[in-house]
UniProtKB/Swiss-Prot annotation:
Disulfide bonds: none annotated. This is B3 domain-containing protein At3g25182. Keywords: DNA-binding, Nucleus, Transcription, Transcription regulation. It comes from the Eukaryota.
Amino acid sequence: MTSMYYNHDHLTASGKNMWSNFYVLVDTAVMLYEEEKQRRKIVSEEEEETQKRIFCLFPRKTRSSLVKRQQKLSGFLTSASSSLIDLNQFPSDSEIEDPLNHHQLLSSSCFIAADFETLQNPSSEPCSSLVLFDCKTAGSEKTETKDPPNPNFPCPLSLCLTENKNRKRRAVEQRKRTGGVKKAKVAPFSQTARETPEWLVNVMRDMKEAKDAKLIFEKTLFVTDVNPTQNRLSMPFNNLLRNDFLTSVESRIIDKDIKNDKKIGVGAILVDQRCKKWGVMLKRWEMKKESGKGSWNYNLICGWNDIVEANGLKEGDNISLWSFRSCGILCFAMEQRSPSLALCLC
């Protein structure tokens, strides 16, 4: 083994022993690297296998060519990028490098230092919004005719506080002139916390390792939600009561689907109030509007028509959707609050 590295016939016995030990260490390091690489590969395969387990319980339905054509015509398979964070709120590189903005950014930094006690006090308002506020109003101050002060001169504490108050006042006046901030649509249901329904508690007790029930969505069904040609329940992002029901692995799958025409989605189980289980798929689509803007929706598909038919759902019915976990698998529970439920249970 040692001859393959170096010809050391001229070395003494102790030198040969040292080199031999060195080669053993090198071979050991290579073996450890290969074992770590194999272990990471196994972990990655286990994560993928977790997502495939749902198809063992509920085989995926074969989609007809008619449904595929209708979905393509309706534009549901179009993809686009989205972000939960509005990057337009942050200054661009050109704005940061602009000398006219240097003093404004410096003033914002001084205000942050001056308001350090507010950060220490939990009852006070977070200052992150103040930082974003200063960045947004930095561009509007370019029109001021005042001589810019020397940026190398330290900013006095009183001046920083005064400048911040002026920025707030100008922002409030500007919002009044433009009609104020656009308010988000309010769901027709109460947003207050509700206890887990008794029937759902019983269902989770019967299922293996079921836990973490969350009320995530409430809706009055539209005609498109019960139309057999649509075969999906639309859940707009803006109407979700909470969006923390996906794991990191499931979120990565949903994010990768954004740029794919053929979306994979996340497998899940839906339980109705009759304790019947259905296999569904959760996917993310962009709904295009005539104005050119779009909105992102979650959609429950691949079995939704069967759920509508079995529960007698119709336009105008009110439903609530809960999420929970059973053996790590994503599960949904549909609570129906309408006369249709009484007819189905009879």
